[in-house]
């Protein structure tokens, strides 16, 4: 089985996953150490960050010219599925008013199996309503870039309208290489002086991305 890594970064909230955790769950010693290292690295990055931002169009050009990624045809079934899933997720985040009675995010009332099943069913119903909203009411500017290396691959997804960058890779060695590439791409995307002054989401996501292992 191939090892796979996925990174999801962006100025705006992207594809949404739901995790139900126990309230009394505690961090392990290893997790506490990792958290401390992350916080220290985050502070160092914040101290040295510079205003060198680029546009999404420039980022698209950068991943192709610097790393040899190629854009995947938007006509393929796989790309159409990914596009629809992202459009649904972004609509729920940025235009919930289009969902009518499903505009409000469902609430998890408790942690019993029945309550969790009910919550997940409501989440799926909401997504289905979003899928049926016409594209002329809400749409995204989705692009996927891929680089294949034998039986492994890495890919970067860029959504220009909401300034989203994400991606992933398969294969242990490829994952390590991808992490370096992804951080460099996000570093190139960068931040503006306004982002630094106002501590925008773009600023926060860049710091968090670069602070990861």
What are these regions (language model features)?
Residues 34-213:
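Conserved mixed alpha/beta catalytic, RNA-binding, or beta-rich assembly cores of soluble enzyme
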């Amino acid at each position: 089985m191939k090892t796979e890594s996925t990174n999801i970064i962006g100025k705006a909230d992207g594809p949404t996953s739901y995790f139900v955790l126990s309230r009394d769950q505690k961090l392990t010693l290893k997790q506490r150490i990792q958290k401390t290292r992350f916080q220290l690295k985050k502070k160092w990055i914040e101290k040295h960050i510079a205003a060198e931002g680029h546009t999404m169009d420039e980022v698209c050009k950068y991943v192709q010219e610097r790393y040899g990624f190629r854009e995947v045809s938007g006509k393929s079934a796989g790309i159409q599925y990914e596009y629809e899933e992202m459009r649904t997720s972004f609509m729920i985040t940025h235009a919930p008013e289009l969902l009518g009675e499903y505009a409000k995010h469902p609430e998890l009332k408790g942690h019993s199996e029945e309550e969790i099943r009910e919550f997940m069913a409501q989440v799926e119903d909401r997504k289905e309503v979003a899928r049926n909203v016409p594209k002329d009411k809400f749409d995204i500017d989705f692009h996927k870039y891929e680089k294949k290396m034998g039986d492994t691959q890495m890919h970067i997804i860029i959504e220009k309208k909401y300034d989203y960058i994400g991606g992933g890779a398969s294969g242990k060695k490829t994952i390590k290489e991808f992490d370096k590439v992804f951080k460099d791409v996000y570093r190139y995307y960068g931040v503006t002086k306004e982002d630094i002054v106002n501590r925008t989401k773009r600023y926060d996501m860049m710091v968090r991305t670069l602070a990861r292992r």
